[in-house]
Amino acid sequence: MAITETKTKYGQVHGVQKDGYTVFRGVPYAKPPVGEKRFCPPEEPACWEGVYKADHFGCVCPQTEHEPDSFYGKEFYLDPEFGMNQSEDCLYLNIWTPANAADEKLPVAFWIHGGAFMHGFSHESEFDGAAYCERGVILVTINYRLGVFGFLAHPWLSEESGVGRSGNYAILDQIAALKWVKENIAAFGGDPENITVFGQSAGCMSVQTLVSSPLTENWISKAIFQSAGGYDTGLNRDMPLSEAETIGQEFVELSGAKSLEELRTIPAEKIVELQEEFGRVNPSRMLSFVPNIDNHLLTCGYNEAVTEGKIKNIPYMLGSTADDIGVFPEMKEKGEHGGIYKGCINWSLALEKLGRKPAYVYYFTRALLGDDAGAFHSSELWYMFGTLGRSWRPKTEGDYALSKEMMDDWTNFMKTGNPNAEGKDDWKPCTKDAPYVQVLDVRK
C-alpha cells in the first residue's frame, strides 16, 4: 500500500489513498502572500501541530474565469469537480506517489501549468498523476501567483525590497515550491536528486526561466519544454526591470492607489478587474506581466543565456503542436507559423554547439476530433497525462494508443534522460547532421 501518512520538515501530513497510489492535495509550500506580504517574495511556511489533512486542493490565484462557451472554457474548465475557489492564499502543491516506503527514491516530475501567466491552476481536469504512478514516477503540481499578483514591478516595491528589484514573485513561488520538493520529497518516496521540471505554454516559459536562473543551481535534473520554449522562438520576452517598473507605474496609476499601503488594501477581485481593464485600455500591455531581468532571478535575456552557456547542463526534451500558433495572433500576423517548432530545433543545435548533449525534439500533429481546431495549443495535455477519458471529445483506439506512447516517452525521460525504452533508440536526439524530430500522432 502506498504511503498514506508521512512527516515533512513542517509537520505530519495525511493523504488520500487511491488504487495503487496516494494523493496529497493542497500542501502549503509557503506562507500565504496576503496583506503586507502581497507583492513580496514567498516565505517558508509555518510548521503545524498534529496531522495536516491533505484531502482537498488548495485555492487558486485570483483570475478571470474562462466563459463556459469559450474554446478553453469548454475544453478544460467545464467539469465542476475541478472548479476553482479563488484566494490570494494560493501557494499550495499536490503530490501523487505510488511509493510504499520513504526509501524508494522514485523519480519526481514537477509540473508548472500554463495560462499566459494570467490563468490556470494545479488541479485542472487534464492534470492527474495516476498514470505516472503506474509507471513509477511521482507527480507534483503547483499553484503560483498570476498576473499582477505574480509580476507587478514598481519603483515603490523596488525601494521597499532594499535590493532595488521587484516583480518576478510568480517565478520565486515556483522556486520556493521546488525547494520544498527538494527538501521533503524523500518522505514521499521520491529522489531529490532526480527531479524533472516540465511545463506547457507559460509553464514552459517558466521552466526555461528556471533553467536559465542562477537561483536553481543543482535543483533540476532534467527539463521538458512544451509549446513555448527554445531558442529564438519569438515568444520569450526579454523585459528589463526598468520596463517592468514602467508598466507597473501605469497599472498603479489606473488603480488610483497613492501608496503601497493603499495598493495592498485593494480587494483581490478588484485587482483582477483592474487587470482586465488595463489590458483593454492598453492592448499592447495585455501580456506584460511576465518575468523581468533583475540581475537576480535572471541576469540576461533568454537567447543570451543559451549562447553564453548559462543554462543548466542537463538533459532536455522539447516540442510543439502543429497548431500552437493559433493562440499567438501577433506571431500569426507576422507569418511566424514555425517559430515555436524552429525554436525547439534551434535549442538542440545550440546545445550541440556548446559541446553538450543535444535534446530530444517532438512535434505533436494529432488533430483532435470534435471540431476543426486541429492540434491546438495544449491539445497534447490530455495525452501525456493519460486523462483522455475526461475530455468531451470523441476518441479512437488510436488516440488511447498515442496517449500510452506519450506517457511512456515522458516517464522514460524522467527516469533516465532518454524517452526511449531500455534497449531502444527509435527517438533520436536532434543534431546538426541529423535534425531528427519525433512526430507524435495516431498510427495509420
Task: Report the location of each language-model feature.
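Substrate-gating cap/lid region and adjacent catalytic-acid/histidine neighborhood
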Residues: 222, 230-235, 254, 258, ...
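Non-catalytic accessory segments of hydrolases
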Residues: 1-168, 192, 283-285, 397-406, ...
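Short glycine-biased active-site loop of nucleotidyltransferases that positions the nucleotide triphosphate
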Residues: 132, 212-216, 370-376, 429-431
